């Protein structure tokens, strides 16, 4: 049997098996774990009462987090004319049209989010095999295909959680970083959960928000009291 590292032993000692934490307790535990060699993100998983095999129960969206994510986000925008200028004014890192598509086809992918004006989709659509597998393809359901590209850039720069329910009925989202205050994480988690409730499929029956888990990149997943977040 492999020996536990010093860090693994410290983590095991810090958590209580089967405990259901308040959000503040979970943040405190994760913030006090031995530091990793890089800045860890804090991630939330929410188990939803949906059947993702049914197309009308696929929950997908984007939530602008009031306390941000703690990460610098590079944004590429497909737009031209006034829309392109507005995107630049909001701090878009890369703005283009056919030239941007050509650059991406050449392997230049130095960005985290891609936003497109509707008239640019004829160009962006040809990049599906490049952007799709990387989760970068613009989609109106998450606000990245929009005539208001400037506002989309603003939201992306502010820090957004983008999510899509997986096969197990769970959404996963980065909600901040280790070192964020409990208050900041609460703002972000409550905003995310509120948006998830708005996205509840009409055909979803029974309990919708079933379980919430908070974790750090290299740390354990801590079960959070759903009522502590949703009430």
UniProtKB/Swiss-Prot annotation:
Highest rank taxon of the organism: Bacteria
A cellular component annotation (GO) from this entry: cytosolic large ribosomal subunit
Purpose: Binds directly to 23S rRNA. The L1 stalk is quite mobile in the ribosome, and is involved in E site tRNA release.
Family to which this protein belongs: Belongs to the universal ribosomal protein uL1 family.
Molecular function, one GO term: tRNA binding
PROSITE patterns with a match to the protein in the record: RIBOSOMAL_L1
GO biological process: regulation of translation; translation
Gene3D superfamilies referenced in this protein's UniProt entry, alphabetically: 3.30.190.20, 3.40.50.790
rRNA-binding in keyword set: yes
Name of the molecule in the record: Large ribosomal subunit protein uL1
Assembly and oligomerization: Part of the 50S ribosomal subunit.
Organism for this UniProt entry: Acinetobacter baylyi (strain ATCC 33305 / BD413 / ADP1)
Annotated keywords: Repressor, Ribonucleoprotein, Ribosomal protein, RNA-binding, rRNA-binding, Translation regulation, tRNA-binding
Keyword RNA-binding among UniProt keywords: yes
């Amino acid at each position: 049997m492999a020996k536990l590292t010093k860090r693994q032993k410290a983590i095991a000692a810090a958590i209580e098996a089967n405990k259901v934490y308040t959000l503040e307790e979970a943040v405190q535990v994760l913030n006090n774990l031995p530091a990793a060699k890089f800045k860890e993100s804090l991630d939330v998983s929410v188990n939803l009462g949906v059947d993702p095999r049914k197309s009308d129960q696929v929950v997908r969206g984007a939530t602008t987090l009031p306390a941000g994510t703690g990460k610098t986000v590079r944004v590429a925008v497909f737009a031209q004319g006034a829309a392109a200028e507005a995107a630049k004014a909001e701090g878009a890192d890369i703005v283009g049209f056919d030239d941007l598509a050509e650059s991406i086809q050449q392997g230049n992918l130095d960005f985290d989010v891609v936003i497109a004006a509707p008239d640019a989709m004829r160009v962006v659509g040809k990049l599906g095999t490049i952007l799709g597998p990387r989760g970068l393809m613009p989609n109106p359901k998450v606000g990245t295909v929009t005539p208001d590209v400037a506002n989309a850039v603003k939201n992306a720069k502010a820090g957004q959680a983008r999510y899509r329910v997986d096969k197990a009925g769970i959404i996963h989202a980065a909600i901040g970083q280790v070192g964020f205050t409990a208050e900041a994480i609460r703002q972000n988690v409550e905003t995310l959960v509120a948006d998830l409730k708005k996205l509840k499929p009409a055909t979803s029956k029974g309990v919708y928000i079933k379980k919430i888990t908070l974790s750090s990149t290299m740390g354990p997943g801590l079960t959070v009291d759903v009522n502590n977040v949703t009430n």
